[in-house]
């Protein structure tokens, strides 16, 4: 079985789903105020590999992630560009998904 670092316990602990064979993952997604960078790619790939490993191991995985679409950085960019913040987030959310699709990261279930 896979072991993951538990930050609260400060140690590696075996992954033990509440319901055997079913794993739920929530991963914070990006704040979409600019194009994705290497750090975004890294966290996306790390959790994509974990998800795929868990699926390969026979688990039913539910993967949930968010897109932060309102934030000071978004509002600052909108002000600098002279356009509504909703246009900024809509544009960069599309850029985000295109980039993740390009590197083969599976999209979240929700």
Where on the chain are the PLM-derived regions?
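N-terminal Rossmann-like or analogous alpha/beta NTP/dinucleotide-binding catalytic cores
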Residues: 1-110
């Amino acid at each position: 079985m896979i072991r993951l670092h538990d930050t609260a316990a400060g140690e590696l602990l075996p992954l033990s789903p509440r319901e055997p064979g079913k794993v739920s993952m929530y991963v914070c997604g990006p704040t979409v105020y600019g194009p994705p960078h290497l750090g975004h790619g890294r966290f996306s790939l790390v959790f994509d590999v974990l998800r795929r490993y868990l699926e390969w191991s026979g688990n039913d995985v539910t993967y949930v992630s968010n897109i932060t679409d309102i934030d000071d950085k978004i509002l600052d960019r909108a002000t600098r560009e002279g356009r509504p913040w909703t246009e900024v987030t809509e544009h960069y959310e599309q850029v985000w998904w295109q980039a993740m699709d390009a590197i083969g990261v599976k999209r979240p279930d929700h």
